[in-house]
Amino acid sequence: QLLEPDADAEYAAVIQIDLNEIKEPLLACPNDPDDIKPLSELQGNKIDEVFIGSCMTNIGHYRAASKVLENMRNLPVKLWIAPPTKMDKFQLTEEGVYSTFGRVGARTETPGCSLCMGNQARVADGATVVSTSTRNFPNRLGNNADVYLSSAELAAVVASIGRLPTVAEYLEAVAGIKPMAAEIYRYLNFHEMDEYRRAAS
């Protein structure tokens, strides 16, 4: 059951965002999660490494990334993959998503925080990175790394071309996701997951 507010709940502030006004992806720029710019102002910037992982992602983001990368072979960047839970990894492996990541040469990490905390590995010193994590503070993912924060879908497009795409390139690359969105973004239902609990134990 989802949480719901009391009918008489009071809020410190109410922020309304009209999503119809957002016509392109937004990124947090190095190295400040509050420094937000549209993709069109950043297009063309070269990227060395891409991290799709951390608690900010869910299973659908990996299916979407796999869809973007399905016809690729060798990527021009180092791609890191780290789903948030073992159950996600198990299901993605069953669906063949991990096969796509393996074919393109992605480095698959132990599910969990991974690069976001720099507690399993780190990006190269001075690398320019696109990450799906929540923070891009200086030196968090790697020494002197410049880290953009983006969606998993944009991160996958970046991994395929080695730079921040134009808006047109992005829209073309993700066009195959929308017709399959209901299946791609289907959640795992944890209350129905005895087999996954066993697999993750």
Annotate each predicted stretch with a short phrase.
Residues Q1-S201:
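Fe-S-dependent hydro-lyases/dehydratases of central metabolism
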